[in-house]
Design a protein with these regions (language model features):
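A short acidic, Gly/Pro-enriched loop at the edge of an enzyme's catalytic core
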Residues: 120-131
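Conserved SAM-binding strand-loop segment of SAM-dependent methyltransferases
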Residues: 107-119
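Conserved alpha-helix/loop element of class I SAM-dependent methyltransferases that forms part
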Residues: 29, 39-62
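Conserved SAM-binding loop of SAM-dependent methyltransferases across substrates and taxa
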Residues: 71-83
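Substrate-binding/catalytic lobe of Class I Rossmann-like enzymes that use SAM or dcSAM, i.e.
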Residues: 166-168, 172-278, 284-287
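N-terminal auxiliary segments of SAM/dcSAM-dependent transferases
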Residues: 1-20
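Conserved class I S-adenosyl-L-methionine
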Residues: 61-70
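A short glycine-rich, Lys/Arg-flanked "PGG" loop and its adjoining helix->strand segment in the class I
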Residues: 144-159
């Protein structure tokens, strides 16, 4: 990751109370899936988790590693749905790690472990049946090295499932170069926008088995739901913003978060959701590795 500490400050060290009031019930800080008939963020979160586990071909009893677990939506879902599995979740955020541990204790879940560690320094002697990652690789730059590490951590018949947001044909960096780069400066320093095909060019150690695409409209609806929840909770959230950003900057940061959700919604809605989308990929180890 180019600037992991900066990305942490921008997103993941913001108090959990903000995300608890802004995200859905499972605190999924990534794209939800709004299939026909779903009209609530809670339902859309759950459907996205179900689809991810189905595509990752997870079965009860497996050893699972999640890279970049966020607020634990997938980690906790897997721990509940696959009670005989053993799950290790990696996060570089202390506040996220503490939240997941506390939630797991409250739900009497004993089949998961959360490690608070920088992905750049993480290593593991353990081997896993499944490795999963949801919107973490967008914060990383050296994908070939990461794919090699993932391959090493997989058992011979293991699988790697990756969920990323992406542009339909162009990969680009988020860099703070001038006054127009407010999203890079305040929300996504050091990040990248992959292209949908980018993972397919990195198959020295992993081989693609299957891939799927979600229309960008799913992310548009997700971001607009976050915005609505945030606006609805303004009275409760305002003291938190003053405590986090200081009274002099609370209003500016309130508007920045609103603009961030609005800008992302419009981005993924562009061209009827066919320009920026979400990609799902299932990899296996290359034969002989």
């Amino acid at each position: 990751a180019e600037l992991p500490h900066k990305a942490n400050e921008q997103h993941y060290e913001v108090p959990a109370d903000f995300f608890a009031r802004t995200l859905g019930r499972r605190l999924k800080y990534s794209c939800a899936y709004w299939e026909t008939g779903i009209d609530s963020l809670d339902e859309a979160e759950l459907k996205a988790l179900e689809i991810s586990c189905q595509r990752a071909q997870i079965e009860d009893g497996m050893d699972i590693l999640e890279l970049g677990c966020g607020w634990g939506s997938l980690t906790l879902y897997m721990a509940e749905r696959y009670p005989n599995s053993r799950i290790i979740a990696l996060s570089n955020s202390h506040s996220q790690g503490n939240y997941i541990r506390e939630t797991a204790r409250a739900r009497s879940l004993q089949n998961l472990e959360v490690l608070t560690e920088d992905m750049n320094r993480f290593s593991s002697a353990a081997r896993f049946d499944r490795i999963v990652s949801v919107e973490m690789f967008e914060h990383m730059r050296n994908w070939p090295l990461l794919f090699e590490l993932v391959s090493d951590w997989l058992r011979p018949d293991g699988r790697f499932f990756m969920h990323i947001f992406a542009h339909r044909n162009s990969a680009y960096l988020f860099e703070d170069r001038d006054a127009n780069d407010w999203m890079s400066r305040h929300f996504f320093s050091g990040g990248i926008m992959p292209s949908l095909d980018l993972p397919l060019f990195i198959q020295n150690h992993l081989a693609i088995r299957d891939r799927w695409v979600w229309n960008g409209r799913h992310y548009e609806k997700t971001c607009n739901a976050w915005l609505s929840n945030m606006d609805r909770s303004r009275e409760e959230l305002w003291p938190l913003f003053e405590a986090t950003y200081g009274r002099d900057f609370a209003r500016a940061w309130w508007m920045r978060w609103r603009m961030f959700f609005m800008a992302c919604a419009e981005l993924f809605a562009y061209n009827d959701g066919q320009e920026w989308m979400v990609g799902h990929y299932l990899f296996e180890k290359q034969p002989g590795l």
